[in-house]
Curated annotation (Swiss-Prot):
Keywords: Chloroplast, Plastid, Ribonucleoprotein, Ribosomal protein, RNA-binding, rRNA-binding. NCBIfam families: PRK08881.1 (NF006477). InterPro entries: Ribosomal_uS14, Ribosomal_uS14_bac/plastid, Ribosomal_uS14_CS. Part of the 30S ribosomal subunit. This is Small ribosomal subunit protein uS14c. The gene is rps14. It is found in: Plastid, Chloroplast. The keyword Amino-acid biosynthesis does not apply. Its main location: plastid. GO terms for biological process: translation. HAMAP family: Ribosomal_uS14_1. Pfam families: Ribosomal_S14 (PF00253). One of its GO terms (cellular component) is small ribosomal subunit.
Length: 100
């Protein structure tokens, strides 16, 4: 299981991304529409002054149960270990063992 601090850090990043998403999108659009280089640089500076963790690139998918960052299945939001256990217990509707 992942360190609790890592899970909380990731949740904090998700909150920051949601909080600044609109402002970030507006600034990026203004940068594209800016005509002069000085204007673009000023807008780019404003974009850089936003918190670093408010960028969606810094997010990392983690398992909802264990917080594991690797082996993550987006469809379920779970790591491969938890997915396998829950599938065997029949807790995931529509998931069956493969047979061919």
């Amino acid at each position: 299981m992942a360190n609790k601090a890592m899970i909380q850090r990731e949740l904090k990043r998700q909150n920051l991304v949601m909080k600044f998403a609109k402002k970030r999108a507006i600034l990026k659009q203004q940068i594209q529409q800016a005509s002069s280089l000085k204007e673009k640089l000023a807008l780019h500076r404003k974009l850089q002054q936003l918190p670093r963790n408010s960028s969606p690139v810094r997010l990392h998918n983690r398992c909802l149960v264990t917080g594991r960052p690797k082996g993550y299945f987006r469809d379920f939001g779970l790591s491969r270990h938890v997915l396998r256990e829950m599938a065997h217990e029949g807790l995931l509707p529509g998931v069956r063992k493969a047979s061919w």
